[in-house]
């Protein structure tokens, strides 16, 4: 299952093809961008949902929707288990497990990365040893999660808080020294707490 919640850096056709090439019986791609925006992000905006008052919970917000789709597809196909790739260190394992168990208590949950206690480096070596193709680029040393609501990164140099994050980490921002000399003003119009117009043009929330 591949859920598109606005990951601009992902090639979904390639991901789907790769899943089939390494043995998946099927690879289901769901365009959930508007559902994510209208059913989840809208509520986060209205609630001003910021972790510790500063951090938009972009990754966390998408997990219940992904788990919900996994359950729906599992039921539709008569699956006996749902597998996910969460580690045993992060909070995502809880978000997936709790949502899945709440919606479908009878289904078995498989979490091989957690059960085998694999590090990121071990995951990469495991994939290489079994000829599973990987996209190894500058992002490979980081664990990056991206959707329409935000982008978060961890691992690599970020494990050392005393060090400044390297410039190649950032995918959505422009450093001041690289920015255009001319500024730009944006106008947003809200209705019942939700943005509905950008520069006097009506838009969907996802856009």
PLM region spans:
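Nucleotide-activated chemistry modules centered on ATP-dependent adenylation/adenylyltransferase
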Residues: 1-207
